[in-house]
Amino acid sequence: PISRRNFIELCWKLTEEDEAQFEALWRYLGLSVDWSQHYQTIGAKAQKIAQAGFLRNLERGEAYQAQAPGLWDVTFQTAVAQAELEAREYPGAYHSLAFHGEGGDVVIETTRPELLPACVALIAHPDDERYSHLFGTTVTSPIFDVELPVLAHPAAEMDKGAGIAMCCTFGDLTDVVWWRELGLPMRSVLGKDGRIVAQTPEWIASERGVAAYQAMAGKTAFSARKALVEALADSGEMLGEPKPTSRMANFFEKGDKPLEIVTSRQWYIRNGGRDHIEANGRQLRENLIAAGNELAFHPDFMHVRYDNWVGGLNTDWLISRQRFFGVPIPLWYRVRESGEVDYDDVIV
């Protein structure tokens, strides 16, 4: 593996080569440019401005770190911000799985059966009469035999799949909402490398559940799905054959695999995506909308776009990345005598 210093040196070399090519092209095209004003977004001046801005954010309480679920690219091995997403159509298949309740089986449909060991609840819409009698009861998961509550939440879609869904930590952003708002436990089984973690989780105790998990452990999500689907078919807890479908999935703009949601420690800037009360007693999101109302937008429709953008934020701005090349966050962490890094003891 290449060292951080050598990697950055190579990046700078490539940057200089690209700059020369772009300048030659733009001169050839006759663009009117003041060549004394060029800069690099990760140059010394830009870094100084960005780092000073971050320290101001930190001082004002606008920047914070958190161990939280976030979008993760398993290929690039880095966290990804909402602004870097691309929605692309992705092939998949619905798998009908039978959860076992006292009054009979409850069938759900999922495109992510490999996340079954991470399931923490079954969730349906509170107005869905098909499942209202189940709210407050429990079921056990197929093959893993884990007891799970059946809960109600308005984000459940009655017309999607079977109308009742398993909440896993985490398959998509809706799972994050359910986990946070319903106070559900964290049961992570997918690592940052995109593979099922090797150690069997403590919440899986049955003999057949342990065997099924060990058959998945260490595999990629795709291979783990294949192994578990075979096991579910053998146990009779997958009903029928998988039904091909396509879904919109989130991709990193530079990636070729759907993003996963992985829990990691990252730095964030408050932007209204999460609840936060400001000094005037109002939510940050409300203050951002109010500030937009004081501006004159040209053209007018950009005001609507701004309001939609603020209203559509579902998380704060994630600014840290697991990359060598970029603007470093100007912080250090103390190291305990044991050699363990204390991320809560920040040195500015």
Give, region by region, the residue ranges found by the protein language model.
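Residue patterns forming the tRNA-binding/recognition surfaces of aminoacyl-tRNA synthetases
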Residues: 1-105, 160-339, 343
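Protease-associated
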Residues: 101-164, 172-177
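Short, intrinsically disordered, charge-balanced linker/junction segments flanking boundaries
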Residues: 344-348
